[in-house]
Amino acid sequence: MSDVTAIKQLVEKQKQLKSEIAKIIIGQEQIVDEIILSIFSGGHALLIGVPGLAKTLMVNTISQALGLDFKRIQFTPDLMPSDILGSEVLDENRNFKFIKGPVFANIILADEINRTPPKTQSALLESMQEKAVTVAGVRYKLELPFFVLATQNPIEQEGTYPLPEAQLDRFMFAVKLNYPSFSEEVQVVKQTTTDTEVTVNPLFNAQEIIDYQHLIRRIPVVDNVIEYAVSLVNKTRPKTEMATDFINNYLDWGAGPRASQNLILAAKTHAAFHGKFSPDIEDVKAVANGILRHRIIKNYKAEAERITEDDIIKTIL
């Protein structure tokens, strides 16, 4: 199949995927879009939202519709790296046998990742970067495609271990989850308080998703779009030649080169989903918020004046 035909097919399948997910998840289109963009771009996503907004249900539904294996890990202060990666046990012949942990799935929901100490966080983050884990000196490759969706509760900060900036940078998207609108919540209550069973049909399989990820990487990008993405990222860096006074006043730290790479990858996926054979500047703008918001560090002045990351990104766009 030619790449042109494959992109046309992807447009149709992506529309079907969204309508399949909408059978169970009401509203939240932007969030679902960003998660799907992240999966097809080969990245990971961080979901920031208060409890009770159907994060687990959303990820479970998306994994069913994609035909992928799904595991949920609840992060707690006493969780150990072996609880995620797996461990070696003695079998009946007194030989060591490796028992795989929950990380050996296609889609991992790392629930409340900031509740566990850095030692355990880094075990998951290594697997995100390397797509492999090392246990007792032996390296095990993970099943592909591999996608981590980590959640964080922005309200409770007691007893949490905030993710360091270097680890946050490994997430392609930071997705902000808001409360549903009044009409959406009415629909949610109607749907969840009856005895009807809704089934989600798988539309893809693991190999198809890997093929689409390769297809997206093959999409060509013109130089001016790459230069625009890199200039956007450069504008977030205070005290550099491209930084405006607004950035110098309100930011301590800007985004690194990984942000530029992710902007282009996500823009390619966004373009493919809309039937375009090459991304333009509008595609970069469409994905900029989700890719930059967790990579810029505000200073005390911005906190005091209640300026959000999205406000800052709006000024550079």
Residue ranges, per PLM feature:
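Conserved AAA+/SF3 P-loop NTPase catalytic/coupling segment centered on the Walker-B
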Residues: 82, 104-129, 143, 158-167, ...
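Walker A/P-loop
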Residues: 39-76
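AAA+/SF3 P-loop NTPase mechanochemical coupling elements
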Residues: 97-106, 135-152, 163-172
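Pre-Walker A (pre-P-loop) alpha-helix and adjacent loop at the N terminus of AAA/AAA+ ATPase modules
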Residues: 8-53
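Conserved alpha-helical scaffold flanking the Walker A/P-loop in AAA+ ATPase domains
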Residues: 34-37, 88-109
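Conserved C-terminal "switch" segment of AAA+ ATPases
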Residues: 7-11, 24, 174-246, 273-277, ...
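A short helix-turn-beta junction within AAA+ P-loop NTPase domains corresponding to the substrate/partner-engaging
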Residues: 68, 161-178, 196-199
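C-terminal engagement/docking regions of AAA+ P-loop ATPases
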Residues: 1, 239-317
